[in-house]
Amino acid sequence: MTDNNKYRDVEIRAPRGNKLTAKSWLTEAPLRMLMNNLDPQVAENPKELVVYGGIGRAARNWECYDKIVETLTRLEDDETLLVQSGKPVGVFKTHSNAPRVLIANSNLVPHWANWEHFNELDAKGLAMYGQMTAGSWIYIGSQGIVQGTYETFVEAGRQHYGGTVKAKWVLTAGLGGMGGAQPLAATLAGACSLNIECQQSRIDFRLETRYVDEQATDLDDALVRIAKYTAEGKAISIALHGNAAEILPELVKRGVRPDMVTDQTSAHDPLNGYLPAGWTWEQYRDRAQTEPAAVVKAAKQSMAVHVQAMLDFQKQGVPTFDYGNNIRQMAKEEGVANAFDFPGFVPAYIRPLFCRGVGPFRWAALSGEAEDIYKTDAKVKELIPDDAHLHRWLDMARERISFQGLPARICWVGLGLRAKLGLAFNEMVRSGELSAPVVIGRDHLDSGSVSSPNRETEAMRDGSDAVSDWPLLNALLNTAGGATWVSLHHGGGVGMGFSQHSGMVIVCDGTDEAAERIARVLTNDPGTGVMRHADAGYDIAIDCAKEQGLDLPMITG
């Protein structure tokens, strides 16, 4: 970026311990999590405020970041800070059970909800792309998507390979903040993986954090390693420096047959996130400033080639699926008429979980102490004693996942269990078992908090894929319930014009008041997911609503 206000050569690290720098834990928590989003161990490009996902930023510019920090340190417990696309625009009197921060990022009136108009606004300093958890201050590094990716690979193994992916291998691309979870998720599921990435710096980061095991010198070397490890039944992840739009067609040409194919490049943002075939990264970034339309066209043409290769694999009978980056849409716009012949991962593998309100529940230890996370891991096992799959996940996470920034954990649980765990964590803070408060949040990719016809709400039973009332209702309900901060975003995951979604974070500070808020929010939030899927006619969701006592007037009334 050429705007000096969007670049600062500084390293940010959230405070640790139990000493406040703000007036209460309800304002200290968003302050620390904002700073944690920009920790160099966490963010992809923190000096430009970019957390992950192409240009997903934590604040609009450095002046806005400074003012957010300053405002949070003085904010009272009966005040609410309003943040508009990464800019702090107002502080208003509310009450002690209201959110301390309300955030709206990247939202545009539908007719203007496209990258061209957004980029004009961004260039003028009038907007910011918040992705999902970048601008809502609850990104925890690649761990945040590891379990969801793991669950996807495990379910694919159940559906296609008799219950296991051992001795199988996954072909994919993208090792950014989200895609970087793929190699570790495949390894944890028991599969090998070949992970193509066009930036060596991202490969180095994933090697350093142990998300990927090793790097091949070239494609031939990668294929030799894959053949060896699958023959030995070993689950080892391999990174390959290169361009997916060049390598996938070459694999098709050679007759190489993976066992599973997906992709998690930043295809949602052709101007900033997808390197055209034959280009260097330096060419791409330079021309994005001077010839944006040509860059977008070249990137989308390469995506069309990439998707055609994925379709070729699918024709061979290889399980092939989109992992939520909107690459099928981009390819379709470039003339690949049947780009949507392979499904998205949600309708293919994840929707039954969403029907029960199960999704990416996460928490972070504001103390900075890893031991606080290990104690909460043990509490989860204690309170959910009979879920062997969940216990195995927690054991693998402790063994294999390196914390990035403040220690955190991701754990997919649903309606009923989220509130149970939240109340237990709050009690652990009250008793002193945890050395400081924890925050509980989630990805916007959850059962009731997103409308995204090419991802989370693809192929809904009743055809309501594009109805975006649901994330709005989710945000309103979480605000009414007393979440500590609530966010409403547009364009996350799949890009401008293709999604609306909401997020929430709540603080466990050990008080009675926190317990009341936790009980409300962590019941209502997944409850909206069950409601949304029950309304669409899913029997699993209807049964869950009845079992959990949800009051759905048109269904349970």
UniProtKB/Swiss-Prot annotation:
Its main location: cytoplasm. Its EC number is 4.2.1.49. Pathway: Amino-acid degradation; L-histidine degradation into L-glutamate; N-formimidoyl-L-glutamate from L-histidine: step 2/3. Disulfide bonds: none annotated. It holds the Pfam family Urocanase. It is an enzyme of class 4 (lyase). Gene3D superfamilies: Urocanase like domains, Urocanase superfamily. GO terms for molecular function: urocanate hydratase activity. Keywords: Cytoplasm, Histidine metabolism, Lyase, NAD. Catalyzes the conversion of urocanate to 4-imidazolone-5-propionate. This is Urocanate hydratase.
